[in-house]
Every structure is written in structure tokens, then in C-alpha cells.
């Protein structure tokens, strides 16, 4: 996972959260990572952990919506977000409540930030 961190760090700082989010989505959706690799990814994300977790949340919601949650998505959710895949997917739904543009920030970005903040703060929907 050090190679992932190096590749992301090669981009401008303004793009890194988006890239960490993509790494989280790929890890949780596609699978194929060992527990050690997932732990390493979490550590490597460092200050970008909320963005990584938001990508994981997108994967969990996508798999839930398709009715194909699986063990690797569950494992990644538990390691990165410290919650079950169902709980993480529910956070994406809760973050849609009263969603709108905020001072020129597009609604999609507001949604992403809400997910990041709710996961970082340990917010649950149950």
C-alpha cells in the first residue's frame, strides 16, 4: 500500500482526497486485499482517512443496493470505518437528508463531506 500512497502523493494536494476516496472505493468494492493490506492502507491514508472512508462507504452502499454485500466489503468497512457494511451504507443515506448546494459548494460535494464527517465522528444511524 506504500505504492498507493506514493502515487497519490505525486498529485497536487488539492486532488488527494478525491484519490484516497477512489482507493477506498476500489478496495471495498473489488476486494482482493488481505487484512494486513487494509490495515496498511488505513495507516497510509493518515490525514486523508475520512476521504478513504467515504470511498469505502460508496462501495458499501453500491453493494447493498445491488443486494450483493460480501465478506471483503464487510471486512474493509470494519477496518477502515470501524462499522459494519450495513451501518456504513446507512450513513450515505442519512447524509442525503436535506441535501442542497451550500454557498457555491455543489450538493454532491456537501454529501461527500457529510459522509466523511459522520464516519470520522462515529455517527451511527441506528
Question: Which residues does each predicted region cover?
Answer:
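Mature, well-folded catalytic/scaffold domains that follow N-terminal targeting or propeptide regions
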Residues: 1-126
Amino acid at each position: 500500500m506504500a505504492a498507493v500512497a506514493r502515487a497519490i502523493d505525486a498529485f497536487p494536494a488539492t486532488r488527494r482526497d478525491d484519490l484516497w476516496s477512489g482507493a477506498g472505493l476500489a478496495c471495498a468494492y473489488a476486494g482482493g486485499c488481505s487484512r494486513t493490506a487494509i490495515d496498511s492502507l488505513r495507516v497510509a491514508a493518515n490525514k486523508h482517512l475520512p476521504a478513504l472512508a467515504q470511498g469505502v462507504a460508496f462501495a458499501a452502499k453500491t453493494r447493498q443496493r445491488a443486494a450483493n454485500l460480501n465478506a471483503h466489503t464487510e471486512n474493509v468497512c470494519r477496518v477502515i470505518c470501524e462499522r459494519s457494511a450495513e451501518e456504513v451504507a446507512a450513513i450515505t443515506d442519512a447524509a442525503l437528508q436535506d441535501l442542497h448546494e451550500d454557498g457555491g459548494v455543489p450538493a454532491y460535494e456537501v454529501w461527500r463531506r457529510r459522509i466523511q464527517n459522520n464516519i470520522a465522528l462515529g455517527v451511527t444511524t441506528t
